[in-house]
Amino acid sequence: MTVPPGKDPAPAPPGMLPAPEIAAILSGTHSNPFAVLGVHAAGKTYVARCFVPGAETVIAETLSGKELGTLERRDEAGFFEGPVALRKEQPIRYRARNDGGEWTVIDPYSFGPVLGPMDDYYIREGSHLRLFDKMGAHPIRHDGAEGFHFAVWAPNARRVSVVGSFNDWDGRRHVMRLRVDTGIWEIFIPGVPVGTPYKYEIVDSNGTLLPLKADPFARRSELRPDTASMTADEIAQNWEDEAHRRHWAEIDPRRQPISIYEVHAASWQRRDNGDMLTWDELAERLIPYCVDMGFTHIEFLPISEYPYDPSWGYQTTGLYAPTARFGEPEGFARFVNGCHKVGIGVILDWVPAHFPTDEHGLRWFDGTALYEHADPRQGFHPDWNTAIYNFGRQEVVAFLVNNALYWAEKFHVDGLRVDAVASMLYLDYSRKHGEWVPNEYGGNENLEAVRFLQTMNTRIYGIHQGVLTIAEESTSWPKVSHPVHAGGLGFGFKWNMGFMHDTLQYLSREPVHRKFHHNDMTFGLLYAFSENFVLPLSHDEVVHGKGSLIAKMAGDDWQKFANLRAYYGFMWGYPGKKLLFMGQEFAQWREWSEDRGLDWNLLEYNLHEGMRRLVRDLNGTYRSKPALHARDCEGDGFEWLIADDRENSVFAWLRKAPGEKLVAVVTNFTPVYREHYDIPLPVAGRWKEVLNTDAEIYGGSGKGNGGAVHAEKRANGETIATITLPPLATLMLEQD
């Protein structure tokens, strides 16, 4: 209906909607469509109103098909209203018709809200711990109809609509209801099937239509380059992992063997045509491989949905959605279940520090800096050109904390390795003077991020016993892996970046120069027990021109392999949990790239297959000898035997655990074959050589001690074993 300029519209008949309100519905500018659309009382009768574009006639019916009345078309664009034979407000449907045929539309505006006052209360308080069941898109049965409930936080928006193929991406069709107290918009849309792409159409407070937004809580997404969210069923996995989860819930992980295989799921292996494997294909190949290799856990680089392959998943736009690259979310649940059935844990890299600025993502979500800081000195990360979460907003903290809980509950993951913690903790991280905003005390500590991390860890450990949190924290921030009640951040473990840096620097030097850098290998023991450490040889060390681990080693090819074998033995004997990035277990020469599989053909060569066997046997030895793992995080599990033999670049120490056999670890980091080398041992008698990285089966020269050494008490009271030290090798000797 149009009104001539200068004239007021004709008044609507009693019970009928005024023309300006109809125009507002048709233009998508009505402030509250739920107040006018659907079924409403009109005196002692009821009237129904609907917007059905393309319809010429509309008949209102009950959900069971009983006719309630024919509605009048008030506007040719498809606005209908009229009296209906009802005694109360209830859900109804419409039978619409035009020259092309007939179709049925269930009226979303005839349904009441789904969220309740208790949801509002906990959301306002910031303490809602099941947002993942309330926000986003969930299949429900509501007032007799099947459909999807949508809910999204956009407190500063003038309008939010759900758009998708079910409404021809028309933002006027499913405008959501605003819950004013929380800023959450919601709507129940009947008849939307599983697997339907959708987004949110948002009009900001100034009336500007924003780029379509993906659902922050979406549990499934389209495959890139498409960016829509997708409706998804709840995960219906038949979990068979009770024994696995009970084990980790009942033990102290610091005293368990933990050897982690770090994997980029898109490039571990590929199909012959170069395509990525699905979760089911990965399960068939990766799980048996890890069992054979003796790893206790698989840690995946981020698998949350991300648009840009070279980001490796660290710039995620869908924290709640397993990436579509490997199939549906149920495939990941099956993968985790398969791991747990054979005793393998699954850890996810998790990125709560920052998010990309893709227009369909979180940045300026409702036309304001909602998830990020408005001030670029706080809200923009100069290293990665990404936005930084505003940890001072309780809604943002709840979004992130709930995401951590979501992966633990819905997918049974065993741990989260939190990425880029240092960038969260320091307000001046990668910033020059004047480019950052001090905290309330004038310091550079991000106190809001500290509180977030403490809250996240407290919630995870409080609700999901047995789930680990691991910090990638590259500075000396104190008490990262100490309990929150003791002033710590509350993580279970922390990556030991210092160990990785110092030892790789040492191994890159020619052996003749190593005596001048002996402290690179001993310094770490000064702080080795200040945190619960994981020793990480991660993906970060084999990219961006750094070369693979084998390429970093000094010397010719024989020395490179011997150096790396000795280094692995050194590391597996060193206190701390272990982490090794894929491909390094067989000494891949090429630097890792995310767009191709590993060079598995190298296993046809003895040196590479020998390296793989060594890592397998190191894992087996580490897991079977409590002395090597039961006191990884406690100083009483380590004792130096030889710490100062700079001239020979020899290191030796004792690993021990209460009531268990002692293990001595001896490393020779020169290519010199040393006979008659004396090492002190605490107990006289026979010590078995349980591992020798120079063994021929590993590609070494086969030098050693014939399977055992003997320690004797000498006249001066010392107990000494005279042993043979193979060149560039590590020995492990167990008290017999």
Curated annotation (Swiss-Prot):
Known EC number: 2.4.1.18
Keyword NAD set for record: no
Involved pathway(s): Glycan biosynthesis; glycogen biosynthesis
A GO molecular-function annotation: hydrolase activity, hydrolyzing O-glycosyl compounds
Active site per database record: D419, E472
SUPFAM superfamilies for the chain: (Trans)glycosidases (SSF51445), E set domains (SSF81296), Glycosyl hydrolase domain (SSF51011)
Substrates-to-products reaction catalysed: Transfers a segment of a (1->4)-alpha-D-glucan chain to a primary hydroxy group in a similar glucan chain
Family annotation (HAMAP family): GlgB
Subunit-level organization: Monomer.
NCBIfam families: branching_enzym (TIGR01515), PRK05402.1 (NF003811), PRK12313.1 (NF008967)
Function: Catalyzes the formation of the alpha-1,6-glucosidic linkages in glycogen by scission of a 1,4-alpha-linked oligosaccharide from growing alpha-1,4-glucan chains and the subsequent attachment of the oligosaccharide to the alpha-1,6 position.
Protein name per the record: 1,4-alpha-glucan branching enzyme GlgB
Native source species: Rhizobium meliloti (strain 1021)
Gene label: glgB
